[in-house]
Amino acid sequence: MKDRRQLYNDFLKAFPVESLKNMTLEQYTDLKKDNSFCYWIEAKTSELGSIWGGCSYKFGVYEYQKRPKINDSRVISDEKYAWYSKYHKVTVQEAYDVVREAIIKIALYAQQGKWNEIEEISELGHSYKWKIAFMYSSELLVPIYKKEMLEQLALHFGMDNPAAKTM
């Protein structure tokens, strides 16, 4: 088991915030490599809070092994990638630009402790967005990304109606 702090630092070395604006689609999602941003967030750093499960839609844009069903209105796909139709983008690169901008905002807001601004970002899945925030927060966030789990924890420690609270 790798030291968690070392793992955290290894991620930041691989994806420093200043490099995000130049992160290519292939660096973001690549099924053949274990060094893509998505792979790091979901798999390599799972000891820093898991976001396993669910579908790949959480990444906004992803390279697929099996093409999504044509009748799934949530997703648009080409011969290699799929992305959310809610982005209203025709090409994967246009969709990826939306995703990359959201990641940059999340990372910068996390460094500044702007948690409410992160909560307002809707381009990415909830758990995925908060895992990214944790990874750029200087470990100021709790590495639990499922809102329901955080609410249960808050109840346990005596907070009244945590579901009604904001970050």
Predicted features, each with a name:
Residues 129-135:
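Short hydrophobic alpha-helical segments that form membrane-spanning helices or hydrophobic packing faces
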Residues 1-126, 137-167:
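An N-terminal alpha-helical hairpin/helix-loop-helix interaction module that forms a charged
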